[in-house]
């Protein structure tokens, strides 16, 4: 997920009515204010509003939109990437300079994040200044101008953004993996293809926003904000584009492999099969399986030697390596498998040892104690992910877009506990028997092909 931060703001919301003043709550007579329960509202136009008044000194508001790269097509690839970088361009209510200078003046922050499914525009700052930040959020998301010369000026930034991201070999592998695993939708890249650099027009940006930034595809989420204020803002200013927008295609899994021979001494390889869509019991089983095999070190600078995958590979290779289970769930599909990093000469033995460990689990070679430990790791990881306001806001927004509702952590933990040992074995069997996808890069002379596993 790419995070881009901008500083900026403006004074009034262009030609529309002034946004309501956000009042800071105060405790009468020194009585401490208690955090409120999460409030959830779905408007008739489909827009979801969720808020939690925690009386924190900082407020955070996020507008989540079903406008990730999966909603692009072959003619407008890279549009969502450029859109992430265009958050501080001139709008109908403020120039680019005014946006940047305004939020900087109040110590605020704008972040734009994106996945293959969604985009999220988030502002945060001192709660007494949330009116300014909220107005800016509304202006950026509902009234962009996308002036041609400003869009053209983003070309160099687009190149740099992609180049920096692709310095990480894992980013390139995950991009290639989705490209080879799917025929459409989820195959679309998070980063603009090179041949599209400088060719995305302001008209394409306007078309994408008009057809995807609609009320029924949005969720407005706030922390440290009154629900009534958030609802009033949504009803007044986020009702400009009705309807469902353009329907996205269902992801079609295909399988295959892509090998990038570049001579690097370290070989990165990911091998996956189609798993399960997010939000169902099977997806929970794959998550438990991921933590059973090893989801990465849980100790800072640790070597993850306690995971089943690491133990298995260590028996078959004396070279340095890193191995973990890979798990990604989307609204209509998912990928599960293994990710290895190894010396080029040892790539074959590392990959085969890791793959054989998953096969062993598929054959029922696991204990109830191991499954319970995996559940505990999964639950701890989930709770820690929603412990911060940033993680909590993201979780609420993602659930609101996916299901139109919110599932509290207690319910999530219950669902994890309900996963049986047999469910984990079944998930492992699905991976072993499923059609595989593979992406690899490095000096691949000793890296096996899919049909050699």
Swiss-Prot record:
It comes from Mus musculus (Mouse). Expressed in neurons and astrocytes of the cerebral cortex and hippocampus (at protein level). This is Cytochrome b-c1 complex subunit 2, mitochondrial. Its main location: mitochondrion. Belongs to the peptidase M16 family. UQCRC2/QCR2 subfamily. The lineage of its organism: Eukaryota, Metazoa, Chordata, Craniata, Vertebrata. GO terms for cellular component: mitochondrial inner membrane; mitochondrion; myelin sheath; nucleoplasm; respiratory chain complex III. The modification Phosphoserine is found at residue 368. The gene is Uqcrc2. Component of the ubiquinol-cytochrome c oxidoreductase, a multisubunit transmembrane complex that is part of the mitochondrial electron transport chain which drives oxidative phosphorylation.
């Amino acid at each position: 997920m790419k995070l881009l931060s901008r500083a900026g703001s403006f004074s009034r919301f262009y030609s529309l009515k002034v946004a309501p003043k956000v009042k800071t709550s105060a405790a009468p007579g020194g009585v401490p204010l208690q955090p409120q329960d999460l409030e959830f509202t779905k408007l008739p136009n489909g827009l979801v509003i969720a808020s939690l008044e925690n009386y924190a000194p900082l407020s955070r508001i996020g507008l989540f939109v079903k406008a990730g790269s999966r909603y692009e097509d072959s003619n407008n690839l890279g549009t969502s990437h450029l859109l992430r970088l265009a958050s501080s361009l001139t709008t109908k209510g403020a120039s680019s300079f005014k946006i940047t200078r305004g939020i900087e003046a109040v110590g605020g922050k704008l972040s734009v994040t994106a996945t293959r499914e969604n985009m999220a525009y988030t502002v945060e700052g001192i709660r007494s200044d949330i009116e300014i930040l909220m107005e800016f959020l509304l202006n950026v998301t509902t009234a962009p101008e996308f002036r041609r010369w400003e869009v053209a000026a983003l070309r160099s930034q687009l190149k740099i953004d992609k180049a920096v991201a692709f310095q990480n070999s894992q980013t390139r592998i995950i991009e290639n993996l989705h490209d080879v695993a799917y025929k459409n939708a989820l195959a679309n890249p998070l980063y603009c293809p090179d041949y599209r650099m400088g060719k995305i027009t302001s008209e394409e940006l306007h078309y994408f926003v008009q057809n995807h930034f609609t009320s029924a595809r949005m969720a407005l989420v706030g922390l440290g904000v009154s629900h009534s204020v958030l609802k009033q803002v949504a009803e007044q200013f986020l009702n400009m584009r009705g309807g469902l927008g353009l329907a996205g295609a269902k992801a079609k899994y295909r399988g295959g492999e892509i090998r990038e021979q570049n001579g690097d001494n370290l070989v990165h390889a990911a091998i996956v099969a189609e798993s399960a869509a997010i939000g169902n019991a099977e997806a929970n089983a794959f998550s438990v399986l991921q933590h059973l095999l090893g989801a990465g070190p849980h100790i800072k600078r640790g070597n993850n030697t306690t995971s089943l995958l690491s133990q298995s590979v260590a028996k078959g290779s004396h070279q340095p390596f890193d191995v973990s289970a890979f798990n990604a769930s989307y609204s209509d599909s998912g990928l599960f498998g293994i990710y290895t990093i190894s010396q080029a000469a040892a790539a074959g033995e590392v990959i085969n040892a890791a793959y054989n460990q998953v096969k062993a689990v598929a054959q029922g070679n696991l204990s109830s104690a191991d499954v319970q430990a995996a559940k505990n790791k999964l639950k701890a990881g989930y709770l820690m992910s929603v412990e911060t306001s940033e993680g909590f806001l993201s979780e609420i927004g993602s659930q609101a877009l996916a299901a139109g509702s919110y599932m509290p952590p207690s319910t999530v933990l219950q669902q994890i506990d309900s996963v049986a040992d047999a469910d984990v074995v079944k998930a492992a069997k699905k991976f072993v028997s499923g059609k595989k996808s593979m992406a690899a890069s490095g000096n691949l002379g000793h890296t096996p092909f899919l049909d050699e596993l």
